[in-house]
Amino acid sequence: MNKIYSLKYSHITGGLIAVSELSGRVSSRATGKKKHKRILALCFLGLLQSSYSFASQMDISNFYIRDYMDFAQNKGIFQAGATNIEIVKKDGSTLKLPEVPFPDFSPVANKGSTTSIGGAYSITATHNTKNHHSVATQNWGNSTYKQTDWNTSHPDFAVSRLDKFVVETRGATEGADISLSKQQALERYGVNYKGEKKLIAFRAGSGVVSVKKNGRITPFNEVSYKPEMLNGSFVHIDDWSGWLILTNNQFDEFNNIASQGDSGSALFVYDNQKKKWVVAGTVWGIYNYANGKNHAAYSKWNQTTIDNLKNKYSYNVDMSGAQVATIENGKLTGTGSDTTDIKNKDLIFTGGGDILLKSSFDNGAGGLVFNDKKTYRVNGDDFTFKGAGVDTRNGSTVEWNIRYDNKDNLHKIGDGTLDVRKTQNTNLKTGEGLVILGAEKTFNNIYITSGDGTVRLNAENALSGGEYNGIFFAKNGGTLDLNGYNQSFNKIAATDSGAVITNTSTKKSILSLNNTADYIYHGNINGNLDVLQHHETKKENRRLILDGGVDTTNDISLRNTQLSMQGHATEHAIYRDGAFSCSLPAPMRFLCGSDYVAGMQNTEADAVKQNGNAYKTNNAVSDLSQPDWETGTFRFGTLHLENSDFSVGRNANVIGDIQASKSNITIGDTTAYIDLHAGKNITGDGFGFRQNIVRGNSQGETLFTGGITAEDSTIVIKDKAKALFSNYVYLLNTKATIENGADVTTQSGMFSTSDISISGNLSMTGNPDKDNKFEPSIYLNDASYLLTDDSARLVAKNKASVVGDIHSTKSASIMFGHDESDLSQLSDRTSKGLALGLLGGFDVSYRGSVNAPSASATMNNTWWQLTGDSALKTLKSTNSMVYFTDSANNKKFHTLTVDELATSNSAYAMRTNLSESDKLEVKKHLSGENNILLVDFLQKPTPEKQLNIELVSAPKDTNENVFKASKQTIGFSDVTPVITTRETDDKITWSLTGYNTVANKEATRNAAALFSVDYKAFLNEVNNLNKRMGDLRDINGEAGAWARIMSGTGSASGGFSDNYTHVQVGVDKKHELDGLDLFTGFTVTHTDSSASADVFSGKTKSVGAGLYASAMVDSGAYIDLIGKYVHHDNEYTATFAGLGTRDYSTHSWYAGAEAGYRYHVTEDAWIEPQAELVYGSVSGKQFAWKDQGMHLSMKDKDYNPLIGRTGVDVGKSFSGKDWKVTARAGLGYQFDLLANGETVLRDASGEKRIKGEKDSRMLMSVGLNAEIRDNVRFGLEFEKSAFGKYNVDNAVNANFRYSF
């Protein structure tokens, strides 16, 4: 056969080589009926062919070359497992891919013609031959694998044995069931596409490249077997029967014909039963038809061929009955089946146990496989092992106490654990399972890839040190578990987000990052660790950029440095890594050929120009201008900043609190960073690292959630940034700027001592709970809110209380309140009284002045406490109140000036000193209805003084019914101003010309109810006064100590309720006199009580002491006497008349006498009529304050209660050998003989005196006293009262006595 050769420049060898130009073609007639007569050409895709008639044809009429390459390389939108993928075409329309999780093409080798099937095996086409460069030497990631043997089957299926376990992928471990009929295959492997279930397969390869555009083919014959140009598509399986699978490469618009060089590449189908991708076969050839159609032919998966080769290179070692398996001089002994034929075989151990090397063991291409969930110990002094690697399958654990050969790399796969306990002095490559580093500098370097492996530290200095600490995270990375150890890095050599630094130990780790130049970490950080970046001095160009993610509840600490958190520019395939180069002299450079990258870019220049998307063809993995960025989530406890810069860039979601000192914080930074080597950072054989960082402007959405505490710092929130301050914001000497386009929401309150500049949106709300109800939040700005742009918006709603002046010269917007809000939106965690005091019953309260003459304000359900002259262009007020008041720095009257006012159902409360007042001036237009004017009197009005004080002015022809006068409760009075409307030539005015005042009965009643608390506390002490003496009549002891605890609740009208816990302790002694027994004693008491009503609540703590005596005559008569003093500390909060919270002390005295007669019906039963009289003294109190500018006072004088009680008790005793129990019940009537004290109220309407009232009630009780032995007694009593204005709802009395 004639062979034609030509000289070609080789990019691989860098010189000239001889290349055969011979092309092979086989022609035949199609089988079948004559009407389907066709001419076909069958071409083995591994043969070199000069013609492009059979070359790859990526159809780029409406798709980009990069789409096909992203497809095969799992880049861009084509991530493994992704669903609902839509490709945006050049014309702007989209193509939705079949409805199936996108395949993981990692089993496909770099050159595309072989596919890993797990372990040290791969598949290809037989016609590629063993010596073909893509078969003899196979590459995945940064690793090179040599073929050592292969096995083939008809027609063209081959499986290779490699010299190492492949660590970059688990491989395509299963094939399709080729015995199925086409219909059965459709059911099992079919997927939905465009509304129909079809037998669709996915493929990837890197054969000779050409592109087809609008029917015209452009060849790039010099491009083949280039890993960067790996490309793919999905195809339709037309024929499943027979010994070949035929696919239609052109059945859809996203078509890419399999090409020369694609021979052996795998065809993947989705197994709907196993929910995974499996291999249907490998490319054998292509059929080209006379009508231009094209089919690819695939040799079917052959499991028998695979198993035969695996069996050839496997040796099973059952250690179930062996204590130790010994390997010496290449011979295995001690397992009951000793052999010397183990060279190049995988030794597959089962049963667990010890493996002893008595000499170094070079197993060639064979590895050590541990095949069950057992523990194995590999020992051997200083002997070494060399081979394909270690495979810890099925959760097995291997304790590695030998060394690996230092001239080779140890490959580790399998989901189990390799526990390395000796320094290895070599490199590790791992892709699966766990490797424990249990020695200092366990490995020289570690290459971790595929995302399924973990390396765990288990010794100090377990990593080798150096700039990267000897660990390199290649494609899809893996996990480094610090395991409680601290670790420092200058740079972490990570190529993508699959790299993870974590700490799974309960002992916290510290991860220190000490880069000395700008550096991007593409990976993730999580677990129980703190992150530190501390420098002695601050300098530029030493920025740490995180574009992967952080997930920890711990802290990050920065000192004298810069940190950026941002998203990651989505990586895409490139045509070539690096620029075009030619080493030949100038006269011979034509031999180097053309720059194929420039040629490919030229084919798509028109689409790029039309769509403005140069990033599609710029041969860069990413570009600042591209629209697709991956969002990074950064979650931490607190970020501590000291003299540092922190920025949140595009596509970042940051969750955590910030504490800053002398630092700069930017949220929504427009500066972004990309790495032109991202995804390809790891170089050489896996132990090198590179980065090429480009910075520039690029904006995308930014999210921040958390709180900020900052001192002497700056905060800038930029366009497209959304900040949710869910925790408190504290800004001391810190200027905050919200730029145009920024959206900021605060929920938990804020304090600032500096101006807050707003060009974007600031919303202040209450703090929501899980039911979306709100706790009130306070926003206090000691400076001002500056609205610096026409688009600026200041919003407050949902229980926000805002304090601070507002200034603007722009057409900004102020929106306060929520028209659907009411108290029902309060969180159940909130005191309604507190909310009422803070918000005044409105949705929002605002205290401050507004100087914004060009701005518009909307107030719904808002209480505006206006503290200074204010101006607005427009104000719309609904269901709100404008309350003119003073501030610490401004005691003057104020004027609110508005060009246009639309007001409905609102109130305007103004102050007057009877000669001047606050004013509302409307310049251009006033409209509305149902609005009221209220007037606070700073001085007491006198009826004889004539008033004429202008309150409101508006343009003439304004409806005079916009405002009307309304009564206002001030203090204890209802004050109704007399408002007179007058119209002149240019305006209409509403003026105060008088007032009407009447007492407010409800406020008066509330004041009396509050002051009656002391009487009710006195009454509770009375009810507990004589309890001790009643006990004495049921005991016979001489002397003793006793204790009593009583708890009760009471109620009265007006929503009043109280509860108390009263504790008494004391001692007493019995004196036997002629005809009577006399007991004398001393007691001390402590009482905790609380009381509440509709308009007040509070608590009282009381302590007291007293003396008592009880005389019991032998005839059954008795008399009890007691004297007692009690001191009370009170704290009460009232919501009427602006009283607020008051702390005050009072005291009371008690003198009581009770007489009665115990008549014994039988020896063990008795009836006891009784009468009691208690006289006392209760100290008075006085409060003085101002309500809405009016002076008020409340006072009650000392008074002397006198309370009587009559009643009868009955009882019966039950006794045994050494015990006695007395049961009793009582019924009584208690009544006041003197009225309670008088309360005096004073306000603008004068003085009001409220006389005290008498009360009475019926008392009921039941109880038990028990005597155990001679000296221990205890009792229990239950009480209740009825028919009184105040009643004891229930009370429990427990006592204990010890006699001595």
UniProtKB/Swiss-Prot annotation:
Q: Known PROSITE patterns for this protein?
A: AUTOTRANSPORTER, PEPTIDASE_S6
List keywords of the entry alphabetically.
Cell outer membrane, Hydrolase, Membrane, Periplasm, Plasmid, Protease, Secreted, Serine protease, Signal, Transmembrane, Transmembrane beta strand, Virulence, Zymogen
Catalytic residues as annotated in Swiss-Prot or TrEMBL: H127, D156, S263
What Gene Ontology cellular component terms go with this record?
cell outer membrane; cell surface; extracellular region; periplasmic space
Q: Which GO terms describe its biological process?
A: proteolysis; suppression of blood coagulation in another organism
Q: What class of enzyme is it?
A: hydrolase
Show the SUPFAM superfamilies listed in the entry: Autotransporter, Pectin lyase-like
Q: Which cysteine pairs are covalently linked by disulfides here?
A: none
Limits of the Peptidase S6 domain: 57-311
Q: Where are the transmembrane segments?
A: none
The protein's name is Serine protease EspP
